[in-house]
Amino acid sequence: MGDEAEIKEHLKPQASSETMDKKHNVKGKRLWQKVKYQLVEFHSLPAYLRDNEYIIGHYRSEWPIKQILLSIFTIHNETLNVWTHLIGFFLFLALTIYTATKVPSVVDLHSLQHRLPDLLRKTDLHKLHSELMARLPSSPSSWHVMDLLYNCLPERFSHGNYTDMCVLHSVREDLANLIAPLIFRPITRWPFYAFLGGAMFCLLASSTCHLLSCHSERVSYIMLRLDYAGIAALIATSFYPPVYYSFMCDPFFCNLYLGFITILGIATVLVSLLPVFQSPEFRVVRASLFFGMGFSGLAPILHKLIIFWDQPEALHTTGYEILMGLLYGLGALVYATRIPERWMPGKFDIAGHSHQLFHVLVVAGAFTHYRAGLVYLKWRDIEGC
């Protein structure tokens, strides 16, 4: 019994010592993790993460996925790069839902009354009359669709023979919306949705790239290729609405322009797979390639203006497209020159550096193109071929 007591007494400090060692190890491990996941400066980065020497600090370097995902809510030099395009993605997701559910929702009465003579010349009035009478079963069979249209639209409102039906302004609008589906045949929306899909893919790919690229060299390589593919997709699909809706009545030029930009987009993605494409020395080459891809859209725009020089919608959409080109071009210039951080290195690490400005300009340019797309839809819904 005495020997056992001695043994136990001898083991007690040893166990206590082992416990203390474990505590020290855990504490040291936590301290190491804390140091390891701190933000570092440019000179401490591995070569594959060195892209812009004018951004001096606040880098994440080779963090595990868990810490990277949590860093979306912390401050570092990629925070605004992630959020500018993540917010842009949700903006275009909302615009896509709006377009699918609300465009077109109500006929523009002002446009209808001014376009009515041209529309009626293109319309099968006998078919229109029968369809309208089917929608108005209580109306006298002696009414003719021409009388109904001209007497109930605003310019003839006070002179009609059927004033009992056209007393209130709301009735006029309801009638216009009743007649419009019989005259207007909405065109296909797939080119517009292709653009919206390309924009969402680009914005989400960019946001994901800026969030995850600091994990490892392999992940960085994959994410950058995804980012370049997104840019090419946005540029290529931006051509689809103007080309399709401008040349929908001329299949040769429509297919020619759409085929050209699609092949060019695929070629750009293939070139971006080259490892040298992501090196800092190729920054100007990357910007020039994407800028040239977008600049090729000048041909169908000029072609559109030659054909539809007398159409207000052609001028309206061209104005939007010029603004879009200026925004994208300015973004490419800022990206390539790394302004303003090259003027004051380290001052724009968190906010205001060139890549963040580039992101904002891309979202603004894409939204401008969305507005142009709405004009194309309204134009072609009314005009057709």
UniProtKB/Swiss-Prot annotation:
Record membrane topology: Multi-pass membrane protein
Domain of life, source organism: Eukaryota
GO cellular component: membrane
Biased composition (Basic and acidic residues): 1-12
Extracellular-side segments: 101-191, 250-256, 310-313
Keywords attached to this entry: Membrane, Stress response, Transmembrane, Transmembrane helix
Major subcellular site: membrane
Record topology, Cytoplasmic segments: 1-79, 213-228, 278-288, 335-356
Alphabetical list of Pfam families matching this protein: HlyIII (PF03006)
TM annotation in the entry: 80-100, 192-212, 229-249, 257-277, 289-309, 314-334, 357-377
Subcellular location: Membrane
Spans annotated as Disordered: 1-22
GO BP term (any one): response to hormone
Entry comment describing in which tissues the protein is expressed: Expressed in roots, leaves, stems and flowers.
Its job: May play a role in abiotic stress response.
Homology family: Belongs to the ADIPOR family.
Protein name as catalogued: Heptahelical transmembrane protein 4
Gene source species: Arabidopsis thaliana (Mouse-ear cress)
Protein's gene: HHP4
